[in-house]
Amino acid sequence: METEDVTVREQIFHDRVRETIICVLLFICLYILSHFILTHFKKSAEFVTDDIEDATVNKIALWLCTFTLSVAVCAVLLLPISILSNEVLLTFPHSYYMQWLNGSLIRGLWNLVFLFSNLSLVFLMPFAYFFTESEGFAGSKKGVMARVYETAVMLLLLSLLVLGIVWVASALLHHNTARESLYDLWEYYLPYLYSGISLFGVLLLLLCTPFGLSRMFSVTGSLLVKPRLLENLEETMNCAVFEEASLSRKLKSTNTCWISAHLEALNKEFLSVQSKRITLELRKRASPWQRNLVYPVAMLLLLALTAVSVLMVCFHVLELLFDESAMPRGMEDPHLGLASFSMLGSLGAAVQVVIILYLMVSSVVGFYSSPLFTGLLPRAQDTTLTQIIGNCVSLLILSSALPVFSRTLGITKFDLLGDFGRHDWLGSFHIVFLYNMLFAGLTSACLINTVTWALQRELIRAFGLHRLPLTVSRSTIPLKLLLANGLSKIH
């Protein structure tokens, strides 16, 4: 009996060591990926300066941002990893090489992401921001440690302020919780704070994702070679070349006084024309199949993914009306390998993973396309450290809310693990139902608006009516004129 107990303890120990090694390896890979991403966007001048102290502070802040971004990427991959792990165990239930893939590993990964998300949002990112802005207390010896002391004091004051706000909010919303002791900080107040942050992230996803789904068509179109009906590409390219040469001569000339006053605007115009000319050259060199096949296929794929997403949400709305099990809820043990989380089996699970990743990409596109957050848009080798911190915080809020967002919309049946499912508002039928209806309505409205304007714009460009004088209102152009102009070009 004693030998069996020792064997069980050894097995538990080896399982824990194996899970720790897997989580560490995954995090190292994501950290390296995040490091390359931030290195591509960071402003190198902030890290190579004559002031060694500022350079050291910026490097430490960049390390914290890299950690936060890696946690955000891991949060995005939580649901895809969980869904695919379940399908792998269903396909290979007795495989010796798949014994490491179990519910304990997935549950531990969810708990670690929840812990590090809290740590990054509440402590690391505020510390990084205050650290870069600090100079040390007046009269103290200058150095990195002086900045650390000032940052620690600022962070302590901010923590007390946030804790007070959370306590007041919990007391107003739930009268009994006002009697909670401060000893319940870790068990109650921090999860309550994260619940509020998660609710904010879910609401932000509700606004950004429909807008991003409509913007995905234009963003993808700008990256691909578009087919142009009835367009003289050679003529358009010659115009762009002549315009670029003219602007280049104006920039090189320093004799006229007005150039120095309008140099910045002229330079922006030159870069825009140059980018247009490069795009035209790429289109000219593109093969016929790339010019006429890739773009339509990509648009059809985006349209199919968007339509499937909206249909899944509409179907989930009907489920909410007739089935209580459709409500999002939390669970402690995922029970992997027992049944598929999709009625279509492995194919349906693969579709769920693709839809979840597609919605995340769309939400990021919508976030950076919105007027409120365009200033945060990172630029290669020209993003300040403050912007990097803001981007990391924003992406972490969006990604940490993605599991709750996907489960609330019914994209997947995989219930939320650990503290991700301990949000009070998840149990409210009215909130969940209204959320699904708003998402379906906003997405449909954005798509209808985008497709209508895009179709009108493409028709105008295809028939050459974009060259009309500005005094002519294009909205009043009759259909007969469109057809007549198009037929004359064909002949």
UniProtKB/Swiss-Prot annotation:
Q: Name one Pfam family in it.
A: LMBR1
Where is the protein found, in the record's own terms? Cell membrane; Endoplasmic reticulum membrane
Q: Which UniProt keywords apply?
A: Cell membrane, Endocytosis, Endoplasmic reticulum, Membrane, Receptor, Transmembrane, Transmembrane helix, Wnt signaling pathway
Q: Which residues cross the membrane?
A: 21-41, 60-80, 112-132, 153-173, 193-213, 293-313, 347-367, 385-405, 428-448
List the GO molecular function terms. Answer: transmembrane signaling receptor activity
Extracellular-facing ranges:
1-20, 81-111, 174-192, 314-346, 406-427
Cytoplasmic membrane side:
42-59, 133-152, 214-292, 368-384, 449-491
- Indicate yes or no for the key word Membrane: yes
Q: Which residues form a coiled coil?
A: none
For this record, the Gene Ontology CC terms, alphabetical, are: endoplasmic reticulum membrane; plasma membrane
Q: Name one GO biological process term.
A: signal transduction
Membrane-protein topology: Multi-pass membrane protein
Source species, domain of life: Eukaryota
**Function comment:** May play a role in lymphocyte development by negatively regulating the canonical Wnt signaling pathway. May act as a LCN1 receptor.
Family membership:
Belongs to the LIMR family.
Subunit annotation: Dimer. Can also form higher oligomers.
| Protein name in UniProt | Limb region 1 homolog-like protein
Native organism is: Danio rerio (Zebrafish)
Gene name as annotated: lmbr1l
